[in-house]
Amino acid sequence: MKRERFKPPEPDDPLCCCGDIDQQREYCCCDCEELDDACERLLRGEPDKPDVFSRFISRMADRLGVSCCTVGPLRLELSVLPPMVLIPGLLRVAAINCLLGVIILTALPLLVLWYYYMTHRRKRRTLFFLSLALFSLAYMYYLFLTEIVPRGDVTHLQVVTATTGMMLTLISLVRTKQGPGFVKSQSLALGINSSLATNRSTNLTLDTDLRNGVSHLKGEKDVKKKCPVCQLVRPPRAGHCRICGACVLRMDHHCVWINSCVGQANHRQFILTLLLFLLTSFYGISLVLRSICPKQSLFTAMLYCPGVYNQYSTALCFTCVWYSVIITGGLLHLFILQIINVSCNVTEREAQIALRNKTGRRRFCGLVVETGDHSRGFLQNWIQFLTMNMDEIGSSLNLTDMV
């Protein structure tokens, strides 16, 4: 017997969960017909479509709003909650003994990588990584003030230095979040006219190219391509971010740790944020190790610190040191790649495209990707990076831009 299809609900039907449904079904909690089919497949033991319940959960999460009279409606992003619960709990469990510490500190990066590839495959924005970074920084600073400072091994100047480093890192992060510089239709029209006038001139100099962030040969015409998604003619080295849904000027990559793209307007500030974080992290790790393992050198104390598990407070600090080392190591790798790319005048997007098209080559164990398109030498590449045009920088930052 063929099952009768689910009929659309009446407007006054109080039992329907859909509410008002428009043509795109953007105001419904779920698709009743899809949910009915999913339940029937579940009762029959048949494999379900993978996106049915994920879309239902995502749509329910999107509809959980928090009203605020000053900043307007804010959506409640559920991905910010797990780091606030898991980080303190897992680190305190890992501090019980050495075996638990090894297991948890090994599994935690693997879980983060798995979640990254899951969200990267779905091309969706998430606040999980930004929440993880900010809460880890705040929790490490909290333990530093409550566990290390009362021991009396840290001077007031060292506390002020560590606090200043953390504040400078947060300020630099806020400036990085102001925007990567998106391609805009009005400014693009002005840019096309300026480019056409420049192409008519045969006296094109390198200094002009460096100031505009575009390197090409003398008298060479700019190649402008139309974005198939935005339907905008984008300037050279711009790229479309499928996560942000916009074209970014001189796009480098979409960084999940700041939940934003890195482009022409914030690339320098992004590298500065990484540098400040690394310096502050290394300094904080050295202060903690000197306090809990005063008789050992810094490198020896990380591997061998006698009696560190005799007290739970010292064991917790030692576990947090290793947690900080793991995070710092990952960001140090990112920082080194950024320095190499700037030195070669290549963005991460251009490097990936060159490798995919087999037009670039790897050197030095894959750290360097040579494309041969924009490099003018080490010194000139850095001059271009430090003086490139910032006319397309984002507007002033507001509270909603932080997420």
Swiss-Prot record:
Transmembrane segments annotated in the record for this chain: 71-91, 93-113, 126-146, 154-174, 269-289, 320-340
Boundaries of every DHHC domain copy: 225-275
Lumenal topological domain: 92, 147-153, 290-319
Catalytic-site annotation from UniProt: 255 (s-palmitoyl cysteine intermediate)
Pfam name, any one: DHHC
Listed GO CC annotations: Golgi membrane
Signal peptide (residue range): none
Keywords, in A-Z order: Acyltransferase, Golgi apparatus, Lipoprotein, Membrane, Palmitate, Transferase, Transmembrane, Transmembrane helix
Reactions performed catalytically: L-cysteinyl-[protein] + hexadecanoyl-CoA = S-hexadecanoyl-L-cysteinyl-[protein] + CoA
InterPro entries: Palmitoyltrfase_DHHC (IPR001594), PFA4/ZDH16/20/ERF2-like (IPR039859)
Membrane disposition: Multi-pass membrane protein
Highest taxon above the source species: Eukaryota
Enzyme Commission no: 2.3.1.225
Subcellular location(s) per record: Golgi apparatus membrane; Golgi apparatus, trans-Golgi network membrane
PROSITE patterns xref list: DHHC (PS50216)
Keyword Metal-binding in annotation: no
GO molecular function, one term: protein-cysteine S-palmitoyltransferase activity
Cytoplasmic topological domain residue ranges: 1-70, 114-125, 175-268, 341-403
Stated family: Belongs to the DHHC palmitoyltransferase family.
Its job: Palmitoyltransferase that could catalyze the addition of palmitate onto various protein substrates and be involved in a variety of cellular processes.
Notes on the domains: The DHHC domain is required for palmitoyltransferase activity.
Name by which UniProt lists this protein: Palmitoyltransferase ZDHHC23-A
Gene: zdhhc23a
